[in-house]
């Protein structure tokens, strides 16, 4: 990691944020691939290979890697990979993104949204820095990564949207998953029919979940959801929880099963940067 790849210090934890790719730091990418595979495999996903590195990490117009580095431990804590979507469009107007393997984009999405969008993917925090494993070191891990996303907004002032997938794993409680997905579709719908999964996950009867949140405002409905999943010995996935409480205008799309990554279930989401709640902006983005 060299000075030219340094982006900023984190607000908490005295860590550092870097942006790199296959060409600027190939050896660091190998370590990212190793840590990503360990991280995702521990949760029931992963590629099954030694390294989680794919075509999108290494091709000519590869994704950038945003990482958090601990100078004290000399370890990578976690990160995202991202790509400015406008840079992924070919001469025929087609977009070459990792999400296009699983989701079909409408013409409206390609014309109205993608030219001003960054795609985020492969969000990860390595096991040694996860709160459930190491509460002290894991306290600010996700917070630090979001400091990095704040830097992206400064780097790319024309960007209006963050688009990506939020992952749930096959061993996640099925009824909790179904309620969570119903909740997302209820409060954060894709009213413009922008994106559809090629092979959408089918959930069961949702009438019981509808009865629990019918007529309730978001905060009260969220309490119902949170109580429901906790009663079943689980919790709302941390990244999902962050996105749900980021803005009122988030859009939720279909959930696709990813057979190339341990059959994880990936829900498409779109966040409008201008609509992020002020307290979140002050914390990470300004």
Regions found by a protein language model. Give the residues of each.
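N-terminal regions that are enriched for targeting/export leaders
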Residues: 1-8
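Short amphipathic alpha-helix that is part of the acyltransferase structural core
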Residues: 9-55, 64-78
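Short, flexible loop/turn elements at secondary-structure junctions
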Residues: 21-24, 70-72, 81-87, 122-127, ...
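Acyl-donor binding region in acyl/amide transferases
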Residues: 37, 47, 87-249
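A short helix-loop-beta-strand connector motif used in the catalytic cores of GNAT acetyltransferases and
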Residues: 57-67, 250-251, 261-267
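Carboxylate/His-rich catalytic cores and anion/metal-binding grooves
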Residues: 63, 68-97
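Extended effector regions of multi-domain proteins
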Residues: 231-234, 264-268, 274-278
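Short glycine/proline-centered loop/turn elements that form peptide/ligand docking sites
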Residues: 236-239, 258-262
